[in-house]
Amino acid sequence: MTIAIHHCLSLLNSCKNLRALTQIHGLFIKYGVDTDSYFTGKLILHCAISISDALPYARRLLLCFPEPDAFMFNTLVRGYSESDEPHNSVAVFVEMMRKGFVFPDSFSFAFVIKAVENFRSLRTGFQMHCQALKHGLESHLFVGTTLIGMYGGCGCVEFARKVFDEMHQPNLVAWNAVITACFRGNDVAGAREIFDKMLVRNHTSWNVMLAGYIKAGELESAKRIFSEMPHRDDVSWSTMIVGIAHNGSFNESFLYFRELQRAGMSPNEVSLTGVLSACSQSGSFEFGKILHGFVEKAGYSWIVSVNNALIDMYSRCGNVPMARLVFEGMQEKRCIVSWTSMIAGLAMHGQGEEAVRLFNEMTAYGVTPDGISFISLLHACSHAGLIEEGEDYFSEMKRVYHIEPEIEHYGCMVDLYGRSGKLQKAYDFICQMPIPPTAIVWRTLLGACSSHGNIELAEQVKQRLNELDPNNSGDLVLLSNAYATAGKWKDVASIRKSMIVQRIKKTTAWSLVEVGKTMYKFTAGEKKKGIDIEAHEKLKEIILRLKDEAGYTPEVASALYDVEEEEKEDQVSKHSEKLALAFALARLSKGANIRIVKNLRICRDCHAVMKLTSKVYGVEILVRDRNRFHSFKDGSCSCRDYW
């Protein structure tokens, strides 16, 4: 090998883009080594594995080579299997078979079967399995393990276990693969059975069981496995912290994070972003601030994903200035996620004009928006009532950025028209959509009809929803709300009766409030224990004071039964956000900000109570409902009564 060719190979190893690679390819041609399988194999390997969007070039290299060998084919099959187009792996594999002079080996089958797992085609998987049998490679450990993964990915646990049972001496990788397959096919008992049979287990075995239980929502089993683990690594702790948070047990997630620190281990990027995500979901502002301090002190502030999580946490906890401070501090490290998170945060708080300005600043910096950016932007326009701007940006998506609108973007436009009262325009917009509208899109319009009291259109929309999702309790409640607001109690009773007959249960409303770095959860209705009694007693005091000092009159249209006015007042007084507010006022020091997170949309009566309480008690109240943030201060709300 000459010095020049050796230099070309060293350049290839450091090559970062397709343009540079084509220049190196030109040098190979110049030195006459382009027909050598070793050098062409190196080029294909670099195209397929190391450079993004270079797979078509790798394929052309393969097609132009006189007699490509198995290594070249395997490399391309592997490249496609790890790409966004895994189905192309099968085409390359078939091409290899047709050549006649190249025979697939264990690597060929392992790569192509992995590709089949990624695009989840059980029929193609069966065909590849048959080919492996034909070539006598089904008993190969590498191929067998990949077959287990493929069948598990396609939801066919029975075949995954059959392949495993037929293996002569399965290694730990195969054991772990079949446990994973069981969990992916929702066979939790089968996974436990196989785990109990293992004579030798490694860290991965325990972590697979832990992750499987978490994904299945079996938290008690996950905790038991976690406590039995002989050694807990970063993956174990991260799985536990993130998984428990995703299952809604936020306080427990925080406890495990503290336990991780007490164990003398340092949180990694995954556990940090996971616990910050838990703070975001639960609205745990105080614990989030502590985590931010830890991030700064421990030197994690350079990690982009952690900063993005901080932006999201502060935004969802109601502190936009702090989110903006983190965002501004990132400077050159900002990625599309950073910009989008900040735009989404502003949108959540009704700062539509500022969100639009930031979007324009992002594009001026040369950052190209993606589909998610436009969802946040359209969301901002919707909550700020910027109808014309929203229409312009929706048009700009495809015309300027060549982004095909997806169902979420159409949903944002329906919300934009619906919130502004342009209900017929929203209806016509849905009818003219080039893609079939989903139940969520129609439900968005139904919510707007309910808010604006348009019963006639609400009934039409409900008919559409009956075709897509007839037994959704939320739709029936929205229609019931519209009838109740109009005083049509017979129609309300009819809906309630049909829900009882069909055994359709209404989604339980709950609210979270942070007191002393602990999250407390309240549900609507009367409870006779612990903190619920305390909250109810304080709420009675608040309601009396609001009536005396602010002339509060309950908006009984929020009560959904045809009962006496006094009973309606009693119903609306027990909403979960009111109980959370009362508990916070009872426990927090005077003047402390109150932060409440609710899973459903705040009703008009609760909204009125929050406004009056902020004035009478001199407190700032932040409520995050299903749709947006409401910042109550001095008797007014940041949403300007538009939500």
From Swiss-Prot:
UniProt KW Repeat keyword: yes
Molecular-function annotations in GO: RNA binding; zinc ion binding
Residue ranges, annotated region (Type E(+) motif): 517-547
Superkingdom, natural source: Eukaryota
Record's keyword terms, sorted: Repeat
Recorded coiled-coil stretches: none
Pfam families in the record: DYW_deaminase, E_motif, PPR, PPR_2
Keyword Repeat: yes
Type E motif as annotated region, ranges: 441-516
Region (Type DYW motif) location: 549-643
Positions annotated as PPR repeat: 69-103, 105-139, 140-170, 171-201, 202-236, 237-267, 268-302, 303-333, 335-369, 370-400, 406-436
Protein name per UniProt: Pentatricopeptide repeat-containing protein At1g74630
Organism, as annotated: Arabidopsis thaliana
Primary gene name: PCMP-H71
